[in-house]
């Protein structure tokens, strides 16, 4: 076997191994993705237009005329433009922690959220259980976010919270 042939064979084998490793990592990440929190009607963020949380003073109701699928659920939008913004970069607009209560995640739990108890912090949408919990969370946003980020990797694979219930 010539040295050139051996080098090409080794390169092909190495590239094949890298491709296999990347594929395994990708599918493992997808398989471990958490379930999106949805309300009793199966809608994320209560059927509101998630882009409007970033662009309007208050969230706008979504419409069945403008929808997109992401993270296994149908998202509703007030306009085709907002739908298109979302589909171009859903991770930019989808709420943190798959729409679960940010305060609860900081306390190592997955709890439902209220679509009107929210805040955008540094370009990220955070939902909370209720306006009262939202106020508590806002007293120490940096501290709660630090704890949430540390807790989320263990919580994410768990099933989504039920639409009714919670521990508050």
Positions of PLM-derived features:
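N-terminal secretory signal peptides that target proteins for export/translocation
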Residues: 1-11
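Short, aromatic- and cysteine-enriched interfacial helices/patches
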Residues: 3-5, 18, 167-168
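Bacterial N-terminal signal peptides
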Residues: 12-28
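Intrinsically disordered, low-complexity terminal tails and linkers in eukaryotic proteins, enriched
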Residues: 27-71, 91-168
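Beta-strand cores of secreted/periplasmic/IMS beta-sandwich domains, seen most often
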Residues: 69-82
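Primarily extracytoplasmic ectodomains and periplasmic/lumenal surface modules that are beta-strand-rich
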Residues: 82-84, 134
